[in-house]
Amino acid sequence: MSRKVFLVGDGAVGSTFANDLLQNTTVDELAIFDVAKDRPVGDSMDLEDITPFTGQTNIHPAEYSDAKDADVCVITAGVPRKPGETRLDLVNKNVKILKTIVDPVVESGFKGVFVVSANPVDILTTLTQKISGFPKDRVIGTGTSLDSMRLRVELAKKLNVPVAKVNSMVLGEHGDTSFENFDESTVDNKPLRDYSEINDNVLSEIESDVRKKGGKIITNKGATFYGVAMMLTQIVSAILDNRSICLPLSAPINGEYGIKHDLYLGTPTIINGNGIEKVIETKLSDVEKAKMINSADKMQEVLSGVEM
């Protein structure tokens, strides 16, 4: 394996991811493409300056033909969410951009794994698979992994424990129909609901805080990028290292949870060097299962109206 990454989109998320990736795993080659041609030139030179500490990497601006021998193609390119916008508001803008990316990457001869983080990520991951014609296990989206990290942070703050001791996930759409899987959540291997500080009102407040956090970050600084860049780093590192990890990602649904639609949605997913190793149907209450189906129905409704 050449340990080559082809990055499409060198904005705030893309450049932060590139920096994080180089500091967290070995990368032989990082090829960066952006429609703003000057930016990858500048970032390639800037990132070179950390290689005395991170190890030797061939970092360079790229064209789509450079995707041919990459192990991973990371798609961060797209119109970012503005204050007051939902992720779904971005659909038709970013679908048009997506097609201009996926087609030439496939035409280059790329045979690796697509990793998508552009929003709305469940929709764009589904469409990346359909446009590319790739096997579903070789297309992955960041899904609800960032939402889940935000949930863990909020629970850790509430219970005054290290975040590493919190095991909790957000499932469904990376967006307004997502939901927290509180019944299966644990803190220091103890069920979350066993803690005296936790009740339905507290959980409702935490759920609201998690859902609103992205919008608050955008209102205050214009964009979110540190969190999602680190999630991308975890995903891509696992692929390059051929290391199995489980994260709540946009994964292909094949009847799990009683969902009838052919789409990608946030669910626990084991990935490795080949892409998706296993999609896990986690235990849900009847209420949570109804929320999962509702999330899928909403995504299908949006997909049905997409202008390709």
Swiss-Prot record:
SUPFAM superfamilies assigned: LDH C-terminal domain-like (SSF56327), NAD(P)-binding Rossmann-fold domains (SSF51735)
Residues that bind NAD(+): 13, 34, 39, 64, 78-79, 100, 142
Example of a GO cellular component annotation carried by this entry: cytoplasm
InterPro entries recorded: L-lactate/malate_DH, L-lactate_DH, L-lactate_DH_AS, Lactate/malate_DH_C, Lactate/malate_DH_N, Lactate_DH/Glyco_Ohase_4_C, NAD(P)-bd_dom_sf
Domain of life of the source: Bacteria
Location of the protein in the cell: Cytoplasm
Enzyme class: oxidoreductase
UniProt pathway: Fermentation; pyruvate fermentation to lactate; (S)-lactate from pyruvate: step 1/1
Positions with a binding annotation for substrate: 87, 119-122, 147-150, 224
Catalyzed reactions: (S)-lactate + NAD(+) = pyruvate + NADH + H(+)
Pfam families reported for this sequence: Ldh_1_C, Ldh_1_N
Similarity field: Belongs to the LDH/MDH superfamily. LDH family.
Assembly description: Homotetramer.
Function: Catalyzes the conversion of lactate to pyruvate.
Protein name from the UniProt record: L-lactate dehydrogenase 2
Lineage of producing organism: Bacteria, Bacillati, Bacillota, Bacilli, Lactobacillales
